[in-house]
Amino acid sequence: VGLPNKINNDILLDIIRQNKIPIISPLGLDKNNQTHNINGDTAAMAVAKSVKSRRLLLMTNVDGVLNKEKKLIDEISSSEILEMVKDETITEGMIPKINACLDAVNNGVTAAGIINGTKQHSCLWEIFSDKGSGTLIRK
């Protein structure tokens, strides 16, 4: 598994200027042209930072970040997230998503959302409604 260190913004922005949506595979090449798999959340975060996105959305099969009572947290700050990781409220598969979101919001992305990709219209609700559909993470 590799980590991204450079994103080719020119290609991405050219596709976006054509009113198309770029589809990005989380694969990367090293200096020896060896192919490496990159965690999809990490790749999405790197792209969001590189193109200076306002929002990063990561999808999962749960509604978002849950508190100790397993209730959805609508919005949370970076410091609150770190406390939840420390006290092990957030564990396992959510950790890479949380790390990607924190990296994004600490490096120029205004907010990051973790939403349930199995729910119909979750992206639209997250983007176009006041309440959203998952957890919004801000700096």
Predicted features and spans:
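C-terminal catalytic "cap/lid" subdomain
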Residues: V1-K139
